[in-house]
């Protein structure tokens, strides 16, 4: 369940990231820790996300959060990159990672196979399309449990 502060934090974080040329790809507020930890995952769409990107976002977002007082108590802000092994969810991510290697998991199995590895072609309303050694594989979306970027390991 999403913490009730995540939507207003998201509304604040997205424009801050956009001003820096970055994208917010995930926000989690861990309130089971003392102090609570606000974790923001970012991506630089122009190049590999680096430490400098995380530092710039951290400084800018910290100032914005402090100014709005969305989080009334002490907290720890962590800004990081989600890394290569991450799940594709939004249409924007499927467009951004076209041509990248992915692993598509299905349940129940599609054509007697539960995991498919190939180059991402696209996603439409009904299917995800991947290229597997020159052959286009069409996987019905209702069967897909997740699509992850694949790093070959």
Curated annotation (Swiss-Prot):
Q: Which residues cross the membrane?
A: none
| Signal peptide start and end residues | none
The alphabetical list of record keywords is: Cytoplasm, Ribosome biogenesis
BP GO terms, sorted: ribosomal small subunit assembly; translation
Which Pfam families does the record match to this protein? RimP_N
Q: Name one GO cellular component term.
A: cytosol
Q: Where in the cell is it found?
A: Cytoplasm
Top-level taxon of origin: Bacteria
State the family named in the UniProt similarity comment for this chain.
Answer: Belongs to the RimP family.
What does it do?
Required for maturation of 30S ribosomal subunits.
Can you say what this protein is called? Ribosome maturation factor RimP
Q: Which organism is it from?
A: Nostoc sp. (strain PCC 7120 / SAG 25.82 / UTEX 2576)
The uppermost taxa in this organism's lineage are: Bacteria, Bacillati, Cyanobacteriota, Cyanophyceae, Nostocales
